[in-house]
Amino acid sequence: MWRIWRCRLSFLFATGCLLGALTAGLGSQMSDSVGRNVQAPAGVADASQEAGDVVEERTERTEEQAFALGPPRRHSSESLFPRNASVTARRRRNRRIALIATAVGVAVILAAVYVLRRRRAQRPQDPEPPAPRSVEDPEVLPEEDEASSSLPPPPPPSPPPPPPVEDPLSPESQTVDLSCLSGTTVRFFGPSHHFGGFTPLYDPAPDKRVATVDAGANALFIGGGGLNGQFAKTLLEEAEKHGIRLTPEELSQHSQRIQQSLLRRAVKSPGKLVELDTGVASPVFARSFGFVPVVPGLMWEESEVGPNVGVTFVHILKPEVTPYGNLNNNVMMYTVAPSGAAPDKTYSLAYKTTIAGVIGAAAAYNDTPAGQQYPVQGLRLPLLGGGIFRRNRSLESIGRANAEGTSLAITRYGPNFELQYMYDPSNAALHGLQEAESTYLASMLD
């Protein structure tokens, strides 16, 4: 910094000196030029000798007048050159300008010398390095790398978009604790604002991990109509959102192939959960499990109740097809209910086996390492067999079979889940459980 100031002051000093010299020379040159520009009268400038004689004659006259008596005789330069008033005024003005310019040059030089001396007297000293801060100083923080300090901080991650919200459930839904189910909490949904009051398969923001049960087909595929078709629609919509190319036919064939493979494994170990790692080969299932409480067709004729009745599958959905992207919605269950055309005793046995398969499969999954870490806490299910499988069977009889099968399954596998029944205009499940609760309480009084 001092070097820069010294260079600036040296340049100012030199400029002042040059300006003073130029202004002084300019004044002298202007005076001379004025003298040269004055023209002598005609006859005088042509003969320098005659001009000299005139001067000598004037000198002699002056001496004579000095010693002569009487008043002195006035004379002027008019005897040599006639006086010009404009030339005289111009000469005086130029002399003033020359004097002023000279004074300005001298002032600039003096100012430069004064500033130079003042700067030299106040020359700053190099600052001393700051003393190192104590380690005990609470404000001492670790220094950041130069590379990281030069870069701007990364922008905060944008918040995730809010999940789409479905129509709220009806306030008519109710929750009860039933003693006949060992205190299991049962929730009955009222009609929603969907067409026909249909209960959504999954909630946008569930407070627990709920597995929704699909009332599947005897051929073990996902698709078609009813609740099975609704599951296919949900999976296909989620896949499309994430750029997964999947057609209804491909989903139907893929799910059928996986579930048939699981069934072949499950019938070899009744009452045990079997697993099939589908993460690589499946576009929708990360892991899949199969469970049968008894071998299908062993205790009844499949020609009466239908094939594959009582088998249950548990599918862990991949994040790309999980409804609303919420991990509490990544469990799907699949079962096959008996045909309502079967005889009453056969139907009752097959129906109880189906309910036992659903609750038993969920309980067995919770016993696995993955289930222990992240267990299923609720089952959302329809009135199984109350759709196209009902045939001529009354809904009341289906409701009673559901209550009996649920009570037996909870007694066997434990009250580990909240049961959530989808909306049913007939309230057959509710009435069947209320009847079972009354019978149970009456038996406790005896």
UniProtKB/Swiss-Prot annotation:
Mutagenesis / variant outcome for changing residue 339 to F: No effect on host membrane association (HMA)
Give the knockout phenotype.
Deletion of the whole MAF1 locus (which includes all a and b paralogs) causes a loss in tachyzoite parasitophorous vacuole association with host mitochondria (HMA) upon host infection without causing any significant growth defect to the parasite. Prevents the formation of SPOTs (structures positive for outer mitochondrial membrane (OMM)). Partially impairs the reduction in mitochondrial protein abundance caused by infection; specifically, prevents the loss of MFN1, MFN2 and MIRO2 proteins.
| Positions of the UniProt region annotated as Necessary but not sufficient for host membrane association (HMA) | 431-446
Tell me where the signal peptide lies.
Answer: 1-20
Q: Quick one: where's region Disordered?
A: 43-87, 120-176
Q: Which residues cross the membrane?
A: 97-117
Q: What keywords does the record list, in alphabetical order?
A: Membrane, Phosphoprotein, Signal, Tachyzoite, Transmembrane, Transmembrane helix
**SS bond list:** none
The record places the following residue ranges in the Vacuolar compartment, namely: 21-96
Q: Name one GO cellular component term.
A: symbiont-containing vacuole membrane
* Annotated CDD domains: MAF1-ALBA4_C
Query: Where is composition skewed (Acidic residues) in this entry?
Result: 137-147
Cytoplasmic-side positions:
118-446
> Pro residues bias located where?
151-166
Skewed-composition ranges (Basic and acidic residues): 55-64
Predominant localisation class: membrane
Its record classes its membrane topology as: Single-pass type I membrane protein
| Subcellular localization | Parasitophorous vacuole membrane; Cytoplasmic granule membrane
Q: Does the keyword Phosphoprotein apply?
A: yes
Q: How is it modified after translation?
A: Phosphorylated.
Q: How does it assemble?
A: Associates with the host mitochondrial intermembrane space bridging (MIB) complex. Interacts with host import receptor TOMM70; the interaction impairs TOMM70 import activity and enables the parasite to associate with the host mitochondria and then with SAMM50; the interaction is likely to be indirect. Interacts with host MIB complex component SAMM50; the interaction requires prior binding to host import receptor TOMM70 and is likely to be indirect.
Domain remarks in the entry?
A: The proline-rich region is not required for host mitochondrial association (HMA).
Q: What does this protein do?
A: During host cell infection by tachyzoites, required for tethering the parasitophorous vacuole to the host mitochondria. This process, known as host mitochondrial association (HMA), induces the formation of SPOTs (structures positive for outer mitochondrial membrane (OMM)), a cellular response to OMM stress, which leads to the constitutive shedding of OMM vesicles containing proteins such as mitofusins MFN1 and MFN2, which normally restrict parasite growth.
Know the name of this protein?
Answer: Mitochondrial association factor 1 form b1
From the UniProt record, report the name of the gene that encodes this protein.
MAF1b1
